[in-house]
Amino acid sequence: MAIRKYKPTTPGRRGASVADFVEVTRSTPEKSLVRPLHSKGGRNNAGRITVRHQGGGHKRAYRIVDFRRHDKDGVPAKVAHIEYDPNRSARIALLHYADGEKRYILAPRNLQQGDRVENGPGADIKPGNNLALRNIPVGTTIHAIELRPGGGAKFARSAGASVQLLAKEGAYAHLRMPSGEIRLVNVRCRATIGEVGNAEQSNINWGKAGRKRWLGVRPTVRGVVMNPVDHPHGGGEGRTSGGRHPVSPWGKPTGRTRSNKKASNKYIVRRRTKNKKR
């Protein structure tokens, strides 16, 4: 993809940019793979806000994406279309399997309409193919990685994300995550070759607040401009710095949320890099 910039015809257009969608080959999704999606506006079943800054936005339909693929080992597929998905930053690819079934997968970089995709231990090492980590050579760039065997892809699913397979020792593989963290993952877990496409997504300049509202993102108000009743940083005469280390509206310190007693800490070889530029 590429980024298309607008001329400054209005204040909202000044500096704004959009994706050119040149890789998208079809505008309507596969009807059998679409389900209704009801907007919650950040509310739970009691009607209380549990996730702030959510609400509104354009109505969406959910595309069912296959994050497992293990039941299609040995069945070749052809890429029928590359499509836009409003529910994620990556594009999705519609596969037509040789047995007649249709499924969506995340579209890797350089995957094109008409390409052949395979799953299982006999698959070639090329973008879009899905294999177990034990069958992938060291140094390969991968994405859509399972955390537990058969559990479905959990890591590296957003646009431009990729993980590097550093080593394999016994039952575990060493993976370098996009954050810089090095983590152990069982070699029976599956991953897809290549990196997720649409990497330029992070370079889009939204231009105006309204475009974020179309996506269902509501404003984020700083605590220092609130009243004391609303936030620990609120109040004071004139502009203030908050007077303390940053905290949440409920007084919890920001950052450093991972517990030292978390059971999965033993699978982290090296913690993620601090202040990593994104």
Curated annotation (Swiss-Prot):
Residues 258-278 have a biased composition (Basic residues). Disulfide bonds: none annotated. The keyword RNA-binding applies. HAMAP family: Ribosomal_uL2_B (MF_01320_B). One of the primary rRNA binding proteins. Required for association of the 30S and 50S subunits to form the 70S ribosome, for tRNA binding and peptide bond formation. It has been suggested to have peptidyltransferase activity; this is somewhat controversial. Makes several contacts with the 16S rRNA in the 70S ribosome. Part of the 50S ribosomal subunit. Forms a bridge to the 30S subunit in the 70S ribosome. Belongs to the universal ribosomal protein uL2 family. This is Large ribosomal subunit protein uL2.
